[in-house]
Amino acid sequence: MTFEMLYSKIHRATVSDANLNYVGSITIDEDLMKAANLRVGQKVDIVNINNGERFQTYIIKGKAGSKDMCLNGAAARKVEIGDKIIVIAYATFSEAELENYKPTVVLVDDKNNIELITHELEGGKYV
């Protein structure tokens, strides 16, 4: 049996731009991608904390150090610059792999600077 589980997330990131005329996706600062173990082209869920929107897209790598969190294409209509979002990636694990399961949670400040990287899910504290 396999289980689809939280793999990684960037929590409470601030939308820095919304580019309606781009093909699609979310552009994420390369440093944030590395911290969250995310990859170019990876499917992610986006949850907009401000308006409750939830949708899927894929990742494009942004410039390291840019603090980019830019929704592109149709997804740009689901956010406003300054909105808080959660970027969530899932992965499939076998029952045996779950014995050592530890997702990556990246907490950022209002300017998308990394505040904390943790692998613990403590009673709703980071989820």
Swiss-Prot record:
Enzyme class, broadest EC rank: lyase
Active site: 25, 58
Entry's Gene Ontology molecular function annotations: aspartate 1-decarboxylase activity
InterPro entries xrefs: Asp_de-COase-like_dom_sf, Asp_decarbox
Binding site for substrate: 57, 73-75
Cellular localization per UniProt: Cytoplasm
Self-association state and partner proteins as the record states: Heterooctamer of four alpha and four beta subunits.
Its job: Catalyzes the pyruvoyl-dependent decarboxylation of aspartate to produce beta-alanine.
Family statement drawn from the similarity comment of this UniProt entry: Belongs to the PanD family.
Protein name, as recorded: Aspartate 1-decarboxylase
Organism lineage string: Bacteria, Pseudomonadati, Campylobacterota, Epsilonproteobacteria, Campylobacterales
Gene responsible for this protein: panD
